[in-house]
């Protein structure tokens, strides 16, 4: 990871989400609801095995279609306890397992899942580039990797505020300054769609398709994202 980015370690992440676990559903969980619903709606049109990285308290689990087999992982045991309670209470038989696991070292074989989703995760993990490569690794050819995340702005009031928050990453549990270029590193993942999400474009969905041998030119995807960030446009397919 570049030394230009504030670094959070795994211990800091665990500690932050130990504090968040009791109140997460009623705080950030509400803010993130629109993005979560949008991602799951897309996933429900697909088939097969789904891996949710950073499943947290399991807010998304009841929304997955019963035709899908869902596995969730998270670094926080306290968050996973909340997720397991939801699975038991709602009798979610399509949830195959919930595991305490580091997203940068997934304990699954290559090409194990048809869809891999990480919602509000990449700004939390200590090494997002390593996590991105793990998402690519466990996704099957033709499968999709879906991110919902906050990406920072370089200019304006929001950009100023994000830069002021940057030194407090360990305390708040996430990177306020996070450039989209950090997830555009996998040559076999073609960026197929970008969608700004509520509230007011604070979050963005990126949908990738795994196409081994495609050798995506990262600069093309970066140019597309730069255009979208400037214009604040709605859903757009990314030209391949």
What is the predicted function of each stretch?
Residues 51, 55-105:
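Class I SAM-dependent methyltransferase SAM/SAH-binding core
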Residues 30-48:
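Conserved alpha-helix/loop element of class I SAM-dependent methyltransferases that forms part
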Residues 188-189, 193-232, 236-240:
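Core SAM-dependent methyltransferase catalytic element
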Residues 7, 11, 28-30, 146-204:
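C-terminal alpha-helical "lid/dimerization" subdomain adjacent to the S-adenosyl-L-methionine
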Residues 1-20:
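N-terminal, positively charged/glycine-rich alpha-helical extensions of SAM-dependent methyltransferases
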Residues 115-127:
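A short SAM/SAH-binding and catalytic strip from SAM-dependent methyltransferases
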Residues 104-115:
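A short acidic, Gly/Pro-enriched loop at the edge of an enzyme's catalytic core
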């Amino acid at each position: 990871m570049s030394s230009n980015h504030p670094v959070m370690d795994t211990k800091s992440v665990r500690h932050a989400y130990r504090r968040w676990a009791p109140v997460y559903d009623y705080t950030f969980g509400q803010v993130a609801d629109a993005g979560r619903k949008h991602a799951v709606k897309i996933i429900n049109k697909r088939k097969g095995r789904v891996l949710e990285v950073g499943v947290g308290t399991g807010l998304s689990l009841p929304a997955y279609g019963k035709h899908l087999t869902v596995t969730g992982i998270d670094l926080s045991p306290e968050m996973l306890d909340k997720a397991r309670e939801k699975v038991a209470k709602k009798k979610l038989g399509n949830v195959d397992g919930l595991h305490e696991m580091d997203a940068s070292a997934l304990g699954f074989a290559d090409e194990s899942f048809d869809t891999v989703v990480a919602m509000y995760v990449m700004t939390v993990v200590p090494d997002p580039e390593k996590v991105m490569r793990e998402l690519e690794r466990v996704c099957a050819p033709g499968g999709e990797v879906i991110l919902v995340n906050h990406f920072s702005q370089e200019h304006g009031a929001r950009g100023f505020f994000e830069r002021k928050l940057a030194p407090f990453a360990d305390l708040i549990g996430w990177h306020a300054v996070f450039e989209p270029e950090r997830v555009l590193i996998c040559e076999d993942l073609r960026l197929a769609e970008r969608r700004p999400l509520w509230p007011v474009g604070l979050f963005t969905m990126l949908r990738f398709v795994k196409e081994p041998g495609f050798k995506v030119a990262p600069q093309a995807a970066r140019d597309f994202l730069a255009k979208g960030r400037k214009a604040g446009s709605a859903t757009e397919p990314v030209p391949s």
